[in-house]
Amino acid sequence: HAVSCFLTRGQLWQNWKHGRDVFDRKLVDSDWAPNNGNWLWLAGVAPFSMPYYRVYNPCPDSKSSLNVEAKEASFIRHWVPELASFPSRYIFEPHLAPDHVQEEAGCVIGTDYPSPIVDRKESRRVNLELFKESLGRIA
């Protein structure tokens, strides 16, 4: 959910077909019907879509119901070795860690690990306005 929402109506405002195509190529269990249906639904462009203002946070913290892993972030620590030494408090959004924490973890954001590509809150606000405006045009 978070990936498709981030790519489309949540933050990047990209066509849902780009994400669908990547999933078609990369998923081991890719299936045309559910892949298309899910991308349409989560992009908010299908008649059966969820309300456009429901935007998933791509960076859930350890307390979020959308966080499917333990507080320890073992999945991130295993698969993203650059972040393995970050304190749990910052591992979901390492760019928020103070400089001294990044240095102690051996990973400076913007040098050793990419900086965020968008301001998540601002892009969400702008995209919600765009979506609301586009719905007004077809009503």
Language-model-derived ranges and their functions:
Residues 1-139:
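C-terminal catalytic domain of photolyase/cryptochrome flavoproteins
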